[in-house]
Amino acid sequence: PTSMAGGVTYRYGNKGSYNVRIWAEELQLIDISGLLISISDLHLGNMPGMKSLVLNSITDTRELNLNTFCPNVESINIGSFADLEHLEIEHCSRLRNIQIYSNPKLTSMELGNHPEVEELYCSYNGFSSFSLKGLPKLRSVDLGYNSALASLELDENNGINALLISGCAFQSVDDVLECCPSLNELSCSGNRLTELDLTKHLSI
């Protein structure tokens, strides 16, 4: 390991598959990024001080459970996991920003209720359906280029004002629009839509 301002950096120089387990009650930031580094067992222990988590370019991790290890995290960035299939992010009551992108095998995610989340970016994954329920402060959503995505679950009269779903498989967005009265930005090109009624959303 090498010391840096504000933390410690570990560099894995040899090829191979690693088991990574981390416990650090005072740690505020984790950034595990690499050129498709192989981590077959990624386990994060109790980290009540964690504010920001970045995990990128990792292979051989098929499931990731972030339910209880970082109750005070505010930002999560998980991208370019070549083999990730299932992700759980629950019980993070201070989470504000979620970025889950470029995980081609990710078809299942348990998001739970997050009262402070304002922005959610989940593009270029493998979702066929997605729930946005239990996110009362959510304003901006990017679910673009989930090529199989054809349905959304939404709370009625939510506060979403920007929705990006280009490159998906929606045949209709009528139900989506009905639940989003505050919507003023919509991107929905590259779907299977045959009509688009925006008479109740004149600000778009």
Q: Which residues does each PLM region occupy?
A:
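Conserved hydrophobic position(s) of the canonical leucine-rich repeat
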Residues: 27, 39, 50, 61, ...
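The feature captures the LRR N-terminal capping module
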Residues: 1-17, 99, 121-123, 140-147, ...
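Conserved, compact domain cores that house catalytic/ligand-binding motifs in diverse enzymes
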Residues: 44-83, 90-91, 101
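Conserved "Asn-ladder"/turn position within leucine-rich repeats
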Residues: 25, 35-37, 47, 58, ...
